[in-house]
Amino acid sequence: MEEDRFNLALRGFLKEVGVTSQREIEKLVREHPPQAGILRLRMALTSPDAPTLNHVIEHAISLA
C-alpha cells in the first residue's frame, strides 16, 4: 500500500462524510427542528470488508 495515495483517498472519504453529514443535519434542523432544543446524533463507522470495525460517535448539539 502506498501511504500517500491511501492518505489522499482517506481524506477524500472523510471530506465527503463531513460535507454530506453537515448538509443533512442542517436540512433536518430547518425542516423539523427538535422541540427540546437539542439534537442528539450518533455516527457509526463500519465496513463490510472489516467486520470488527465498529466505531461509534455520539454527540448532542444545542440549538439554542
Name every feature range the model reports, one short phrase each.
Residues 1-19:
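N-terminal acidic leader/helix
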